Regions:
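A conserved ligand/cofactor-binding region detector
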Residues: 1-313
């Protein structure tokens, strides 16, 4: 499993504020550490949406296999690596065995028990990759923490690939006032499509990482528009149904003040912040009346059951 890093869109305002969008693929086991950086706008492929057979096949073909076998010692860091060749061979064999067992159990839960992929795929996550789109005006803290030798080795690997590209790659494109940072919108589309349509297409294409990996398929403005409208949900109806608006955070236009904030961006007006009602209010009483809490009540009634009884058997 390779850690893949691409810069999809890189822009800098005339005031000097830089906005960069990365497309990433990395081991699922380090995703929680990426998620701790709240200045990031991100969308990621969800194991709730990927068919079980596809997840199992990806693990069979290309499972996550640690590239650094750190020896046990006190604390969070492992400074010494397992170097004995027989030991490394045994560790890889045991890890591969665990992946095969989990794949078999996941398949049985799906085929024999008829369970949904949102549950079954959880078993496969330690061996899977995840595709992520990240946009931010502030990467310095991420690099300072995750490029440091104290960071977990595999997130160091990701962070250094990102830092190398960020600092030594091509220079960002200068965007003037009223010009837009639009990931996945081609130069030809910038010439041929109205600006509002370009925004819609960019939003939908950023969102699709949640449903499928970008595979080079020809984009469709019609399908992009359909997905965009689904993401907005009930915002235009005022019925309290939440929108799914995180894909609207990757598009932005420069602010005159390079230090002014908009959402989690600095120096750029974030598209999401221009959408009326983008922060959906929560009506507790109405949610209860609609039955939104039914699942939580069901699980509350079951959480005192002792699963260890089954495990010990």
């Amino acid at each position: 499993m390779k850690t893949e890093v691409k810069i999809i869109e890189d822009s800098i305002s005339e005031a000097g504020a830089r906005l960069t969008t990365f497309q990433l693929a990395y081991p699922r086991v380090i995703h929680a550490e990426v998620m701790t950086h709240r200045v990031f706008s991100r969308n990621a492929s969800s194991s709730r949406a990927i068919p079980v057979a596809k997840m199992v096949a990806s693990i069979a073909d290309d499972p996550f296999m640690p590239m650094y076998w750190g020896l046990n010692e006190p604390g969070m860091q492992s400074r010494k690596e397992l170097t004995d060749q027989m030991g490394v061979k045994a560790a890889k064999a045991l890890w591969s065995h665990a992946a095969r067992v989990c794949a078999r159990v996941a398949t049985d839960l799906y085929e024999l028990c008829g369970l949904h992929k949102q549950l079954v795929n959880r078993i496969l996550e330690p061996f899977s990759s995840i595709s992520v789109i990240v946009s931010s005006t502030s990467y310095e803290n991420f690099f300072a923490l995750r490029c440091h030798p104290d960071a977990e080795p595999h997130i160091q690997h990701l962070a250094w690939k990102m830092a190398d590209l960020y600092y030594t790659g091509p220079q960002p494109t200068v965007r003037k006032a009223d010009e837009w940072h639009l990931p996945y919108v081609s130069a030809a589309e910038r010439e041929s499509l109205p600006l509002e349509t370009q925004k819609v297409c960019s939003v939908a294409r950023c969102a699709r990482v949640s449903y499928r990996t970008h595979d080079g398929a020809s984009p469709s403005v019609e399908k992009d528009t359909e997905l965009y409208n689904r993401l907005l949900g009930g915002l235009d109806k005022g019925d309290g149904e939440p929108g799914h608006l995180s894909p609207l955070e990757h598009q932005a236009t420069p602010l005159a003040d390079g230090k002014a904030a908009s959402g989690n961006f600095v120096g750029w007006q974030q598209f999401r912040q221009t959408i009326p009602g983008q922060a959906t209010p929560f009506d507790y009483a109405k949610a209860v009346a609609r039955g939104w809490r039914d699942m939580a009540d069901l699980l509350s009634a079951r959480e005192d059951e002792d699963p260890s009884v089954l495990v010990r058997r």
